[in-house]
Swiss-Prot record:
The keyword Transmembrane applies. The chain crosses the membrane at residues 34-54, 78-99, 114-134, 179-199, 227-247, 289-309, 321-341, 348-368. This is Cytochrome b. Component of the ubiquinol-cytochrome c reductase complex (complex III or cytochrome b-c1 complex) that is part of the mitochondrial respiratory chain. The b-c1 complex mediates electron transfer from ubiquinol to cytochrome c. Contributes to the generation of a proton gradient across the mitochondrial membrane that is then used for ATP synthesis. Binds 2 heme b groups non-covalently. GO terms for biological process: mitochondrial electron transport, ubiquinol to cytochrome c. Keywords: Electron transport, Heme, Iron, Membrane, Metal-binding, Mitochondrion, Mitochondrion inner membrane, Respiratory chain, Transmembrane, Transmembrane helix, Transport, Ubiquinone. Belongs to the cytochrome b family. A ubiquinone binds at H202. Its main location: mitochondrion. Heme b b562 binds at H84, H183. The gene is MT-CYB. Gene3D superfamilies: Cytochrome Bc1 Complex, Chain C (1.20.810.10). The cytochrome bc1 complex contains 11 subunits: 3 respiratory subunits (MT-CYB, CYC1 and UQCRFS1), 2 core proteins (UQCRC1 and UQCRC2) and 6 low-molecular weight proteins (UQCRH/QCR6, UQCRB/QCR7, UQCRQ/QCR8, UQCR10/QCR9, UQCR11/QCR10 and a cleavage product of UQCRFS1). This cytochrome bc1 complex then forms a dimer.
Length: 380
């Protein structure tokens, strides 16, 4: 019998082993769809971003008007821009749900896959930040000023580091130029890291909702999960299209319709919604360096989760106390997101501080204790 080209060709063989004949657990739920959704987000963002870059000018005098020109005069430029801007929001929705799934089902015990995933999150956050600066509106400019300024809190080298990042003594033309270069480069880095992420995942195979080995019951990825993924794509791309067509500015800041002006500070400087939880943690500490450390810790804490797993069971499926704690953590993050969008005034300051303390307490103290407690209750 002639060999199947899908299984013998050096390149097709790799695609076959990761997308067609990949042995997958038969019981993985819709929570396992977000990986492929993130892949679609990345592809959409690179495509729309490339089309936008062909019409964009990375110069302080022209950036704002070049974006306006794209929306007004380029064929479907408005649609490309709206898909790109809102695509970022969907990217973050998917990655947060993907991380939440990994946390709930103990997927972090695949340490290499988890760590590359956290690096991917950090790279995505960096990409979104530099991208937000490019339209050169008021919030772009002041957001860049505030966030880059945080590096000056680093002892001894801080100020030098900030001026080096700016390419001068303030956020100006050199800053915009290098941010555009970074925004163009980083998505391709994300694509490269994604292949590493998948390589590590395919070493162990997928986890599943029961957290037990699924070697005794595997099914091929195609046609079962290819079809399931395509359903996921339509369920994500439909709301994205609706948002981009009907209310494209819903998630944006009205301040960004005003061109950047270093002489006028907006009344409330705040980042896009997907950074608000971290921004709230940053603001909740009165000390600059302390705030920066808390901000970094809020994301870097994810690297510690594999070491804080004390339960004998992998997933939270049969651990009700941990489940309760997990949903309290989710609620807490929503509270932080809301507080981050509010002005720095009386009730919000204390709410933010309490929510920040709760966030770290749950992750660092309560989860390991609960895991150990459940072991005792189950007589492990």
């Amino acid at each position: 019998m002639a060999p199947n080209i899908r299984k013998s060709h050096p390149l097709l063989k790799m695609i076959n082993n990761s997308l067609i004949d990949l042995p997958s657990p038969s019981n993985i739920s819709a929570w396992w769809n977000f990986g492929s959704l993130l892949g679609i987000c990345l592809m959409t963002q690179i495509l729309t971003g490339l089309l936008l870059a062909t019409h964009y000018t990375a110069d302080t005098t022209l950036a704002f008007s070049s974006v306006a020109h794209t929306c007004r005069n380029v064929q479907y430029g408005w649609l490309i821009r709206n898909l790109h801007a809102n695509g970022a929001s969907f990217f973050f929705i998917c990655i947060y749900l993907h991380i939440g799934r990994g946390f709930y089902y103990g997927s972090y015990l695949y340490k290499e896959t988890w760590n590359t995933g956290v690096i991917l999150l950090l790279t995505l956050m960096a990409t979104a930040f530099v991208g937000y600066v490019l339209p050169w509106g008021q919030m772009s400019f002041w957001g860049a000023t505030v966030i880059t300024n945080l590096f000056s809190a680093i002892p001894y080298i801080g100020q030098t580091l900030v001026e080096w990042a700016w390419g001068g003594f303030s956020v100006d033309n050199p800053t915009l130029t290098r941010f555009f270069a970074l925004h163009f480069l980083l998505p391709f880095m994300i694509a490269g890291l994604t292949t590493i992420h998948l390589t590590f995942l395919h070493e162990s195979g997928s986890n599943n909702p029961l957290g037990i080995t699924s070697n005794c019951d595997k099914i091929p990825f195609h046609p079962y999960f290819t079809l399931k993924d395509i359903l996921g794509f339509t369920l994500m791309l439909l709301p994205l299209t609706i948002l981009a067509l009907f209310s494209p500015n819903l998630l944006g800041d009205p301040e960004n319709f005003t061109p950047a002006n270093p002489l006028i500070t907006p009344p409330h400087i705040k980042p896009e919604w997907y950074f608000l939880f971290a921004y709230a943690i940053l603001r909740s500490i009165p000390n600059k360096l302390g705030g920066v450390l808390a901000l970094a810790a809020s994301v870097l804490i994810l690297f510690l989760t594999p070491f804080l797993h004390k339960a004998k069971q992998r997933t939270m499926t049969f651990r009700p106390i941990s489940q309760l704690l997990f949903w309290i953590l989710v609620t807490n993050l929503l509270i932080l997101t809301w507080v981050g969008s509010q002005p720095v005034e009386h009730p919000f300051i204390i709410i933010g501080q309490l929510a920040s303390i709760t966030y770290f307490t749950i992750l660092l103290i309560l989860f390991p204790i609960t895991g150990a407690l459940e072991n005792k209750m189950l007589n492990y």
